[in-house]
UniProtKB/Swiss-Prot annotation:
Belongs to the plant LTP family. SMART domains: AAI. The keyword S-adenosyl-L-methionine does not apply. The keyword Nucleotide-binding does not apply. This is Non-specific lipid-transfer protein 10. GO terms for cellular component: plasma membrane. Plant non-specific lipid-transfer proteins transfer phospholipids as well as galactolipids across membranes. May play a role in wax or cutin deposition in the cell walls of expanding epidermal cells and certain secretory tissues. Transmembrane segments: none annotated. It comes from Arabidopsis thaliana. Disulfide bonds join C26-C73, C36-C50, C51-C98, C71-C112.
Length: 116
């Protein structure tokens, strides 16, 4: 259990510490995606609040700059935290499972600069 909790704590701490020039702060990204952590780690049903958070990010990130900022925040966190490939696959599948189309993949190799 500690192997799961420590990376999640680091994930959340790095989200709070990371800033963005876009109108949507990394703190806002964290607040919207925080309800998804339980699903990614433990599985089960996806909480409504998780899908709602993904929808809110999609609606709030209207400009290319906003979308790139959200992408960079997610990518930065994923790149700095030790995680299992299973967690990454679950996280990457969330937008589709919530019926939300994001202009980028939740993946450490995503090129956020290419988002329009």
């Amino acid at each position: 259990m500690m192997r799961v909790v420590l990376p999640l704590c680091l994930l959340l701490a790095s989200i709070f510490a990371w800033g963005s020039e876009a109108a949507i702060s990394c703190n806002a990204v964290q607040a919207n995606l925080y309800p998804c952590v339980v699903y990614v780690v433990q599985g089960g049903a996806i909480p409504y609040s998780c899908c709602n958070g993904i929808r809110m990010l999609s609606k709030q990130a209207t400009s290319a700059s906003d979308k790139q900022g959200v992408c960079r925040c997610i990518k930065s966190v994923v790149g700095r935290v030790s995680y299992s490939s299973i967690y990454l696959k679950k996280a990457a599948a969330l937008p589709g499972k919530c019926g939300v189309k994001l202009p980028y993949k939740i993946d450490p190799s995503t090129n956020c600069n290419s988002i329009k």
